[in-house]
Amino acid sequence: MVFIDACFRKKTPYTPIWMMRQAGRYLPEYMEVRNKAGDFLTLCKNPKMAAEVTLQPVEILDVDAAILFSDILVIPLEMGMDLRFEKGEGPVFSKPVRTWEDLGSLYEFPEEKLTYVYETIKIVRKKLPKDKALIGFSGAPWTLATYMVEGSGSKTYAAIKKLIYTDPEFMHALMIKITEAVKAYLVKQIESGVNAVQIFDSWASALEKEKFFEFSWDYMVDIAEFLKERYPEIPVILFPKGIAGYLDDIYGKFDVFGVDWGTPIDLAKEKLGNKYVLQGNMEPTRLYSKEATKEGVEKIVEVMGAKEGHIFNLGHGMLPDLPVENAKYLVELVHDLTRR
């Protein structure tokens, strides 16, 4: 698999590409299945439908890897939290976790209830071409904790940051519980057939440097090193969004560092390119224009070179109204410009 070889800096015929949120609303085929499911969570919990939308970008765009269709919040959902998706507001938990009593009420083994995810993986792996990788994923403990404590997305993260400074013992206890759940969940994904895993820390930038390492990165690395010890052949990708100023102190045993679009790729290469394969990082809105897409690809390829050490991706997720034709063009362009 070209994607897996690239994760380990092995020789590849071209730079592989996949896109975060590549299975999504910009694809009419996705919307068809989504409408049939009725709502987002039903789609996530239906292995046949979730497998179908996981496979769509590989069939339509010819990306080098499929990423499991699911949601990061299935972990807190199966810990017993009441989750709903509000139109225009996104995910909402009706009862946030803010006290020791709340923490004690969380079910400790959510991975046992996530059988629909493992079933999806098995279906996809059977149908996916042998040369295409399947990426499993989880939210990072910090990002999951922010949703669980805030109760929804947040602009200030005031509730969780208040706990960091007023009750760090509670926060670490919550982080440990989530971390153990993520480890078990990713082990089950690997055992079900994924070829690589990515851990998404969407809200990493909410923390000042010292607290980022204490409450986010240390836990991500703990998961990565736990997995690498058991499954050295499975690449681990870490994606902390918005931490360009912290790159000097990034450490840990993992394979690929995901670069968001706000971090200059040349800076990431200078700071981390010798230690980790880099993944990223075109600004997603460039895909509204073929000219802007071409310029974005050329800039990144100029820095990273048509050689090992890079996986092409966007620096954030696909937007719902991006033209499918431009996404196809991006994949073709990356393959053509980087052919060895």
UniProtKB/Swiss-Prot annotation:
Query: What enzyme class is recorded for this protein?
Result: lyase
What does the entry give for GO biological process? Answer: protoporphyrinogen IX biosynthetic process from glutamate
Q: By its UniProt entry, which InterPro entries does this protein fall under?
A: UROD/MetE-like_sf, Uroporphyrinogen_deCO2ase_HemE, Uroporphyrinogen_deCOase
Q: Which domain of life is it from?
A: Bacteria
Query: What exactly does this protein do?
Result: Catalyzes the decarboxylation of four acetate groups of uroporphyrinogen-III to yield coproporphyrinogen-III.
Give the matching CDD domains.
URO-D (cd00717)
What keyword terms does UniProt attach to this protein? Answer: Cytoplasm, Decarboxylase, Lyase, Porphyrin biosynthesis
- Protein known as: Uroporphyrinogen decarboxylase
PROSITE patterns named among the record's database cross-references: UROD_1, UROD_2
Output the Gene Ontology cellular-component terms.
cytosol
Pfam families per record = URO-D
Q: Which Gene3D superfamilies match?
A: 3.20.20.210
Binding positions for substrate? Answer: R21, Q22, A23, G24, R25, D71, Y147, S202, H316
Report the sequence similarity comment from the record.
Belongs to the uroporphyrinogen decarboxylase family.
Q: What is the catalytic activity of this protein?
A: uroporphyrinogen III + 4 H(+) = coproporphyrinogen III + 4 CO2
Please list every transmembrane segment annotated in the UniProt record, as residue ranges: none
- Primary location group: cytoplasm
Q: How does it assemble?
A: Homodimer.
Involved pathway(s): Porphyrin-containing compound metabolism; protoporphyrin-IX biosynthesis; coproporphyrinogen-III from 5-aminolevulinate: step 4/4
Q: Which residues are tagged with the site Transition state stabilizer?
A: D71
E.C. number, please? 4.1.1.37
Q: What species does this protein belong to?
A: Nitratiruptor sp. (strain SB155-2)
Where is this chain's protein located in or outside the cell? Cytoplasm
Q: What GO molecular function annotations does the UniProt record carry, in alphabetical order?
A: uroporphyrinogen decarboxylase activity
